[in-house]
Amino acid sequence: MKKLEILNLRGNKIVDIKVLEKVNFKELKKLSLSDNKISDIKVLGKVKFEKLEILDLSQNKISDINILEKVNFKELKQLGLFNNNISDIKVLEKVKFEKLEELNLPGNKISDINILEKVNFQELKVP
């Protein structure tokens, strides 16, 4: 799977994604894990997706996104986290997604968005 560029696992019943740290996805550009039953994404701190541009974790059961502070996805342009259980987005102040253009957070439990004035995503597009 070294040359795999797109992995779409949308709409399954996936709960555990720890296997990602054991697989070599050097060329992966798009990973869709949306519409599953994932709640723990800590494994993302252990994987190396050097070319990942799109990560879709929407429609899962994710509540804790603090691991995003430790991931190093230099090429990430789109991050989908809509329809999860996220309430705290303070970690966004610390993440280093220099090329992020699109961040999708609708359908969560976020009540305080004041942190957004401190977020520095150089390429983020606002409609």
Please place each PLM-identified region on the residue numbering.
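Intrinsically disordered, low-complexity segments enriched in polar/charged small residues
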Residues: 34-35, 42, 64, 82-83, ...
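Low-complexity/repetitive intrinsically disordered segments
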Residues: 1-19, 32, 109-127
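Conserved hydrophobic beta-strand positions in leucine-rich repeat
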Residues: 4-9, 28-33, 52-57, 76-81, ...
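A structural signal for leucine-rich repeat
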Residues: 1, 17-26, 41-49, 65-74, ...
